[in-house]
Curated annotation (Swiss-Prot):
Component of the cytochrome c oxidase, the last enzyme in the mitochondrial electron transport chain which drives oxidative phosphorylation. The respiratory chain contains 3 multisubunit complexes succinate dehydrogenase (complex II, CII), ubiquinol-cytochrome c oxidoreductase (cytochrome b-c1 complex, complex III, CIII) and cytochrome c oxidase (complex IV, CIV), that cooperate to transfer electrons derived from NADH and succinate to molecular oxygen, creating an electrochemical gradient over the inner membrane that drives transmembrane transport and the ATP synthase. This is Cytochrome c oxidase subunit 7B2, mitochondrial. Component of the cytochrome c oxidase (complex IV, CIV), a multisubunit enzyme composed of 14 subunits. The complex is composed of a catalytic core of 3 subunits MT-CO1, MT-CO2 and MT-CO3, encoded in the mitochondrial DNA, and 11 supernumerary subunits COX4I, COX5A, COX5B, COX6A, COX6B, COX6C, COX7A, COX7B, COX7C, COX8 and NDUFA4, which are encoded in the nuclear genome. Residues 61-81 are mitochondrial intermembrane. It comes from Homo sapiens. Coiled coil: none annotated. It is found in: Mitochondrion inner membrane.
């Protein structure tokens, strides 16, 4: 069991080290990496490709989707045994 004084000292040290680390990172010049430069373009082109592929699939290759059986299914007569 830690004494309250030691526990407070350790927690304040952790907080100070976190704050110092954040201050160091905020002063560093951030050079753009791949995601900063091309991230939105890659995301937009990937989305456009997926949408175009699904639109083509849904409309052009002749899949019979069978969304509703109304008008296609007729009930059969009961067979009495």
């Amino acid at each position: 069991m830690m004494f309250p004084l030691a526990r407070n000292a350790l927690s304040s040290l952790k907080i100070q080290s976190i704050l110092q680390s954040m201050a160091r990172h905020s002063h560093v010049k951030h050079s753009p990496d791949f995601h900063d430069k091309y991230g939105n373009a890659v995301l937009a082109s990937g989305t456009a490709f997926c949408v175009a592929t699904w639109v083509f699939t849904a409309t052009q290759i002749g899949i019979e989707w069978n969304l509703s059986p109304v008008g296609r299914v007729t009930p059969k007569e009961w067979k009495h045994q």
